[in-house]
Amino acid sequence: MATYSFYVNGREVTTEENKSLLRFLRDDLHLTSVKDGCSEGACGTCTVVIDGIATKGCVMTTKLAQGKQILTVEGLTHEEQEAFVYAFGAVGAVQCGFCIPGMVMSGAALVRQNPNPTEEEVRWAIRGNVCRCTGYKKIIEGIQLAAAVLRGEKQIDEDLERGDDYGVGKRAFRVDVRRKVLGYGKYPDDLDERDFPDMAYASAVRSKYPRARVLKIDASKAEALPGVLGVLTAKDVPVNQVGHLIQDWDVFIAEGDITRFVGDAICLVVAEDTKTLERAKRLVRVDYEPLEPVRNIAEAKAPDAPIIHKSFNAFGNLVELHDNVCQSRHVTRGNAKEALAHSAHVVTHTFETPFTEHAFLEPECAVAIPYKDGVKIFSTDQGAYDTRKEVAHMFGWDKTPERVVVQTMLVGGGFGGKEDVSAQHLAALAAYRFKRAIKCRFTRQESIDFHPKRHAMLGTFTLGCDENGKFTGLDCEINFDTGAYASLCGPVLERACTHAVGPYTYQNTDIRGYGYYTNNPPAGAFRGFGVCQSEFALECLIDLLADEVGISPWEIRYRNAIEPGEALPNGQIADCSTALKETLLAVKDVYEKNADHAGLACAMKNSGVGVGLPDAGRANIRVEGGRAVIYSATSDIGQGCNTIFQQDVAEATGLPKSAIENGECSTEAAPDSGTTSGSRQTVITGEAVRGAAFLLRDAMLAVERGQEVPATPVCAHGDGATIEYDDDTPYVDNHPGDLTAGHAVVPQDPVAALAALEGHEFRYVYFEPTDKLGADKPNPKSHVCYGYATTCVILDKDRRVSEVYAAHDSGKVVNPIAIQGQIEGGVLMSMGYALTEDFPLKDCVPQAHYGTLGLLRANQIPHIDAIYVEKEHLLPVAYGGKGIGEIATIPTAPAIQNAYHRVDGVLRTKLPLEGTPYSRKKTAGKEAEKSR
């Protein structure tokens, strides 16, 4: 038998198996820095250095590696490792972290060959590595800074990572940088037989057809295969439905039932190893009767259309359906029809936006084990308690959901795409059935085909204004294709409707929204949560009105921009922190200098769920081992909320970073603080953390005064204006400056005071009521707060996007290192949405692979200037911070369209935009490949 020998990190290794180098490094050598993002050579997360050249591990085999020198992050010199850790942390290059080891290796290969690379050389070196979080700019800066450190021109600032001064507004080195850069931080797929010696593997056989009757499932040959533990079907599931809010998603399609999309699971095969698993899946025979699918909104609305769902369960109620309308919303205020009839100028157009894929770098994965009287799931998702609820429902444990324990590990990006269960419930089902640890991991293609996308929209918008350009009214109908299952159709549709009005001052609106079931892949949450679609349409119409009035696009927005004390179109009074006009002023000069080839757009985005729904932030702080340990079941999916929570504690108590840590994010150890969605964690959970930190601070001050502090947990709650202990005793704050960063009264020796409180616990719940949609009030409060933004896009002489100026009102900037990367990443994601990204379907079947999604690469990015506006007057909640994660993705797409409209006079109402230099290429990925 042939053997293959090569060197990995200086050590000779030998194998008799010709396999992917990626799999050998991960499975045989357990080098977890080498990530499996696609296994098709498209993403770069598995990049290693082979004989000095950055190479994707998934396209190299052990046979081809014969005699070669292979280097991973683990094999870099100590000096190189420290340089990259410091540099990536100092500039904010690390968000979800899944792409980072691959980026480091591409950077290390470059720096070893060229110790002083230019920005263009770095862009070129990492063009094969995809990052979906940062927009690449911070990674480029990080590689250049690492090179400067290794040349001896820059020194590592050890104080920055140590974080002795770690409060709000300070440059905070993220808490997870080191483990993500060096690759030892664990995502679910990094769990293996070393963690669970009895681990087995599960994978679903999925439908070949978007709509077909399942006539017969024959798994007998698969079950007879040695190494197969069993094959689970619908009859093995206590409750064969899951769903985030609406339970309409079948766990498995049973014999006699009809599939709804090609991602539907027919059965789950469980085997001792992955080779046996894949062989067994091929042995499962499924007989179908193919049926005509419902391809789009028009077909879904047809009178003779097949009804995709006859009913669903929502909040414990059975809802019967008689058409394909999954959800609908009607948002109205004033009299839009009359206002438009009396307007000096009115414009109407129909807009179309596509499905788009989240393309997070980490495919879905879960590991489940039998645990106590139920199961424990190690998961990558956006809400541990949401997953617990869905999985408990599947088991029929609605009254005892604690039998399901969910622990969130590192999450390799989400952007809304990990709010629904995917692999978690399948792993749990198999673990409970076979009493074994089970790993269920999606391939990249399964991920693309299965998880919910951004909703495709078809909408008609009518906007009017008076002779001076003041908006008078908006009428629109928004139609969403929600695909085969509801996912978060209702909330996303609602947000699209409530934000379709924009951040302006007019009061006549009539907005109808409908979400239709089709046989396409489901659509659900995606960064922007429906607002990207509706504000694209609105902001394009605003430019048309400016032309009719005879004023500039900047001027018409400034005349209508919301200010503190004024009413938004939904009636909510803009609070003191509102700074939309300031964002417009921030880009005014650059826009006016380039007005004939520039585009402008504004946006607003809520923080928190709002609209009268329960949306509490919860946090506990326990003193353990001389540290303040923050417990909150909050998923940090790359946005950096764990770092922000530590900054909140540092600000309130005066503690250094070394005395603060984040505890286990699980439903067993931490309280429910809601989904990482709706730009809510900085505000909602951040305020809960701050409240708990105040309770801790008070106890620390009592220690310094020589007072005895009872060992019982201290519990309190607040609504942003008042705080009460849970026994209804009012909380008396003798330090009014506490609400403003930089003014807190803290102990003289916080570390010593903390040590005296070992074992003490401080619990806080923050809930600020909001009003329901359509509340009968003159000025209802829909959300705790809004962020605002203005983006200016400039085209070059070749009609390519050359510069983007993104000005944001994000309240208090909690971490200046993090905010720029969030804005830059959002801008680039929105640029892809506008120009290159698509998710083509043929008769409801996805045609995309990761490399054909149109994701922009590092050598295609424009200059991005992230501008943040801080006002003196801020909200008292969470030190005045607001969410930045979603709003950064909203205004860039319409600004790009408006720039092209300025240049050639063509209104483009469909995304991705046609007739641009980008549209001549089928995908950005192919363009990048061709340029090599």
Locate predicted features:
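C-terminal catalytic domains of large/alpha subunits in multi-subunit enzymes
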Residues: 234-235, 397-403, 433-438, 467, ...
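Short acidic, glycine/serine/threonine-rich loops at helix termini
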Residues: 85, 107-111, 136-137, 144-145, ...
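Short beta-strand elements
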Residues: 48, 179, 185, 365-370, ...
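Signature of N-terminal electron-transfer/Fe-S-associated modules in redox systems
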Residues: 1-161, 611
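Thiamine diphosphate
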Residues: 414-435, 439-441, 644-648, 851
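Glycine-rich loop/linker segments at domain edges
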Residues: 92, 170, 176-182, 322-366, ...
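Helix-loop-helix junctions that connect adjacent transmembrane helices in secondary transporters/permeases
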Residues: 307-395, 560-627, 647, 750, ...
